[in-house]
Amino acid sequence: MKIVKYKNTEHHEIWDNYVKTSNNGTIFHQRKFLSYHKDRNFDDSSLIFYEKNTIKALFSGAVIDKKLISHPGASFGGFVYNDMTFQASRDLIALLIEFCKKNGLNEITIIPTPFVYYNTYNEAMEYSLFHMGFQIKEYYISSFVD
């Protein structure tokens, strides 16, 4: 698996198409929404995770003060994916940690998509984050009307 840093001119369409067909992508992950915040003081460091030329996941994020964080232009961000197994989520997280170390980033803060927005309920990523030493620093409540 490999990580490619998002580039607007090359990846806009494939990013948005993946979000639309993903299990947990929302308007907050769409590039049009994230681009609205382009004049803010952060480096958009969104990432695309490929496995054999196929997108495995996206990560909408930014770098501020040597920290990779969920995109500050959205209420939540983090990983966007289709089907996710426990092992696949561990592999993605390990690759993200390795990427951060190689790029001199010393902290990762993720605000995951609330489960209410998932097409199919799946806690593999959140469990893997916990299992790999990530800590919950904040809780948010989400609800919706159908």
Regions found by a protein language model. Name each.
Residues 1-31:
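Short amphipathic alpha-helix that is part of the acyltransferase structural core
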Residues 2, 46, 78, 109, ...:
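Generic structural signal for residues positioned in beta-strands
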Residues 6-7, 62, 82, 113, ...:
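Structured loops at beta-to-helix junctions and adjacent beta-edge loops in soluble globular domains
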Residues 9-10, 53, 85, 116:
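Residues that cap or initiate secondary-structure elements
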Residues 10, 41-42, 137-138:
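A generic fold-level signal
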Residues 13-14, 32, 95, 124:
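Exposed alpha-helical structural elements
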Residues 17, 34-100:
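Conserved donor-binding loop and adjoining core beta-sheet/short helix segment
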Residues 88-146:
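Acyl-donor-binding surface of acyltransferase catalytic domains
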